[in-house]
């Protein structure tokens, strides 16, 4: 198996004055076509099922889109913000998920300015529940990082 990398942006979207967290994958690294995936995470807490069957990426819904710079907030707002109305607040954290040949997973949480990073790992051979829990914890940490930063761009 080859190593696979995925990038996710976790923004905060406001609809009717309620805050929701959504995970929007932007590109699969090394792909000129800019494949992405969409999975839901409300307020940074992932559903335990999270649409991830036997491997962490197999259950993601893939869709084709143009590659986009990860840290371009104006482009981010243009691409995703208007799908949810005009009350978009802020992009929050970027999460990189890497699936390694030994079946281990690495999750890196980047701040939106790209200046700081935290890493969480899940060893090869871990049960699916542990992989899901690790990603859930990464999303919760991302949500905590969001709360510490200014709301508006």
For each predicted feature, which ranges?
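Short acidic DE-rich linear segments
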Residues: 149-153
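Negatively charged, low-complexity tracts enriched in Asp/Glu with abundant Ser/Thr
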Residues: 46-94
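Intrinsically disordered, low-complexity regulatory segments enriched in Ser/Thr/Pro
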Residues: 2-36, 98-133, 137, 141-146
């Amino acid at each position: 198996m080859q190593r696979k990398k995925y990038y996710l942006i976790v923004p905060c979207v406001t609809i009717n004055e309620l805050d929701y967290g959504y995970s929007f994958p932007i590109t699969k690294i090394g792909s000129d076509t800019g494949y992405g995936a969409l999975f839901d995470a409300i307020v940074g807490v992932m559903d335990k099922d999270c649409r991830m069957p036997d491997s962490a990426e197999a259950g993601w819904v893939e869709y084709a889109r143009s590659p986009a710079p990860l840290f371009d907030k104006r482009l981010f707002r243009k691409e995703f913000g208007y799908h949810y109305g005009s009350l978009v607040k802020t992009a929050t954290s970027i999460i990189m998920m890497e699936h390694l040949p030994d079946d281990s997973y690495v999750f890196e949480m980047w701040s939106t300015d790209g200046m700081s990073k935290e890493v969480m790992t899940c060893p090869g051979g871990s049960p699916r529940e542990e992989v899901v829990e690790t990603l859930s914890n990464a999303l919760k940490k991302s949500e905590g990082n969001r709360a510490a930063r200014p709301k508006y761009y």
